[in-house]
């Protein structure tokens, strides 16, 4: 019988259209590295968003079990390679907690200084590439110019622009060169005008606001459910910052504000990052003042750290200690510890389990971007395809730390 009764759409008069699946990335310029999203689209609306990770997986946590504690330090530079020193910081704090090492004050201040430089490095890249993802081409050019100056400060402190390995258990590897503090201070007085320029281009820009306001809204309940940290939390109005909530190093001596948003959308997260850069500048300027007053060693001399060059030329024991330290490495007392820092992307934590040998028994890395990306399906559902790029941009994902 051919009267059409066995065709549903003939009865309803509407045709059922199958949703179609597309790949977003890994070659997409807005995918920030090797992100692959499988998107199910209903026309232009995202119905489902499935992140496929692991394209940059290098087995870091497993590799760390067969290296000494010091040899593991450079792996942390390669996680979030946008602001490398912040990650080393967490590893050093974990080792210092287990061994009970006290960092000398000057070393502690240098760490704070470079962590804040790292925060500005990260936020500059994030804000400017976020602008590029939604169609503004000028900010990235300005942002990279400023990042270049900061990279030079990295290089002058430790000889490397990117993979620094500058923080060591017990402090930092070497003291800062004499003129470096003056140059950082001079830069910190010039930088606000650059931020004002970026501010003028983006903050009240109609197109930028249309692309970011009410996109990727995150509520306070969702923050707790998905385990967000960092700007994703502060953009929604919760003033949670580990530098203030669980002060580590000497952050409790510094005077700075914690910027918070109120709508929890992409635009608020952009505003929070802009303001955080200004707060980081305050911390940098305070750290420079404190460093000028504080003299002394930058590394806690002891079993964890190498003897000075002068000692090695005169003392046989110092030479033996140096040789043992760089071949066998130092032994860490058995136990387990969790150390976390407020990295630019969120709470970067290290869970370290030691069995008393010179190698970690297990090290678990808590990457903030991993938890943010995992909620992509929840956040992007119901948005348009073009908004996916804006959401990923403000989540601030870097695949070194997500795939690790």
From Swiss-Prot:
Please give, as recorded in its UniProt entry, the membrane topology of this protein: Peripheral membrane protein
What is the reaction catalyzed?
A: a quinone + NADH + 5 H(+)(in) = a quinol + NAD(+) + 4 H(+)(out)
List the EC numbers from the record.
7.1.1.-
Which compartment or compartments is the protein found in? Cell inner membrane
Q: Which UniProt keywords apply?
A: Cell inner membrane, Cell membrane, Membrane, NAD, Quinone, Translocase, Transport, Ubiquinone
Which coarse location class applies to the principal site listed for this UniProt protein? Answer: membrane
Q: What class of enzyme is it?
A: translocase
A single Gene Ontology CC term = plasma membrane
Superkingdom, taxonomy of origin: Bacteria
Q: Name one GO molecular function term.
A: NADH:ubiquinone reductase (non-electrogenic) activity
What's its job? Answer: NDH-1 shuttles electrons from NADH, via FMN and iron-sulfur (Fe-S) centers, to quinones in the respiratory chain. The immediate electron acceptor for the enzyme in this species is believed to be ubiquinone. Couples the redox reaction to proton translocation (for every two electrons transferred, four hydrogen ions are translocated across the cytoplasmic membrane), and thus conserves the redox energy in a proton gradient.
**NCBIfam families cross-referenced by the UniProt entry:** NuoD (TIGR01962), PRK06075.1 (NF004739)
The family classification in the record reads: Belongs to the complex I 49 kDa subunit family.
Q: How does it assemble?
A: NDH-1 is composed of 14 different subunits. Subunits NuoB, C, D, E, F, and G constitute the peripheral sector of the complex.
Name under which the protein is recorded: NADH-quinone oxidoreductase subunit D
The protein's organism comes out as Dinoroseobacter shibae (strain DSM 16493 / NCIMB 14021 / DFL 12)
The gene from which this protein is expressed is nuoD
């Amino acid at each position: 019988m051919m009267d059409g009764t066995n065709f549903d759409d003939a009865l309803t008069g509407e045709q059922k259209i199958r949703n179609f699946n597309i790949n977003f990335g890994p070659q997409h310029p807005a995918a920030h590295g090797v992100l692959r999203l499988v998107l199910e689209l209903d026309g232009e609306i995202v119905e489902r968003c499935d992140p496929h990770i692991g394209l940059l997986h290098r087995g870091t946590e497993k590799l760390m079990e067969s290296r000494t504690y010091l040899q593991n330090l450079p792996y942390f530079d390669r996680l979030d390679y946008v602001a490398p020193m912040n990650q080393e910081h967490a590893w050093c704090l974990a080792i210092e907690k287990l061994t009970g090492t006290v960092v000398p004050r000057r070393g502690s201040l240098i760490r704070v200084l470079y962590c804040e430089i790292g925060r500005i490095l990260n936020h500059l890249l994030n804000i400017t590439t976020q602008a590029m993802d939604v169609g503004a081409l000028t900010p990235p050019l300005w942002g990279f110019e400023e990042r270049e100056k900061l990279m030079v400060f990295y290089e002058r402190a430790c000889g490397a622009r990117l993979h620094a390995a500058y923080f060591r258990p017990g402090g930092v590897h070497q003291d800062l060169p004499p003129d470096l503090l003056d140059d950082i201070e001079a830069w910190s007085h010039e930088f606000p005008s650059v931020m004002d320029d970026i501010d003028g281009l983006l903050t009240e820009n109609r197109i930028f606001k249309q692309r970011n306001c009410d996109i990727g809204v995150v509520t306070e309940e969702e923050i707790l459910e998905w385990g967000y940290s960092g700007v994703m939390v502060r953009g929604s109005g919760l003033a949670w910052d580990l530098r203030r909530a669980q002060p580590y190093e000497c952050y409790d001596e510094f005077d700075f504000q914690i910027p918070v948003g109120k709508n929890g959308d992409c635009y608020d997260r952009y505003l929070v990052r802009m303001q955080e850069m200004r707060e980081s500048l305050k911390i940098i300027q305070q750290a420079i003042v404190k460093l000028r007053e504080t003299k002394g060693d930058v590394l806690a001399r002891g079993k964890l750290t190498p003897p000075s060059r002068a000692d090695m030329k005169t003392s046989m024991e110092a030479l033996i200690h140096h040789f043992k330290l760089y071949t066998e490495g130092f032994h860490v007392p058995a136990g387990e510890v969790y150390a976390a820092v407020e990295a630019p992307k969120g709470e970067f934590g290290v869970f370290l389990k030691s069995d008393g040998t010179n190698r970690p028994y297990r090290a678990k890395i808590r990457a903030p971007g991993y938890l943010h990306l995992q909620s992509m399906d929840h956040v992007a559902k119901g948005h348009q395809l073009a908004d996916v790029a804006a959401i990923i941009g403000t989540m601030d994902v870097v695949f070194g730390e997500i795939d690790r």
